[in-house]
Amino acid sequence: MLDKGYIEQILNSKNEVLESIGLKVKSGVYNRNKQKKYDEIVGFCEHLFKVIFNEVGKKRFVFLECSCGKSYLSFVINSILSSFSENLIPYFYGIDKNRNVIEKCVKIKSVLGYSNMEFIEGNTINYTPPRHVDAVLALHACDTATDEAIAKGIEIGAKFIIVVPCCQNQIRPQLKSGHPLTALTDFGLLRYR
């Protein structure tokens, strides 16, 4: 089982990956500005591997990361899984509306020599992956993007849908005084997540 300590141990040996995606600086030191992101990714991976680890080695496991942004998550998962066996080659689709981040992901993929990753500019809800997807992922996808990831996972029949929502900018303004859910937003962290 991959616990947090083991995941971090693997990542400590992956300087090239972590530097390429900006979680470490060239000296091998963790980027303090990205420490929170690193911790979120490690935590997400710990939960992800608890759920999928026994399934991953059975066949070519396909991931779809929705609203992938800079795709830290897919790059980290790819590097962790590739450390177990040369025969264990997952496949990743990353989709995001932002052309700039998709272009950066394509460059990083090329630098790292990852031929098992594709990055697509577009909307999650309109995208149909060319292969069957085993796991749909979303980490801090904003507004309705988490909902779209869940809907896409159901639509394409993914066995696993693992998401961590972000801020709900469209819902928060609707929780006005007198709304039955207003009490949920008394605590700032809940109000903005």
State the predicted function of each range.
Residues M1-K36, V42-E46, V62-C66, E86, ...:
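Class I S-adenosyl-L-methionine
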Residues C45-F53, N78:
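Generic structural signal for well-ordered alpha-helical scaffold segments
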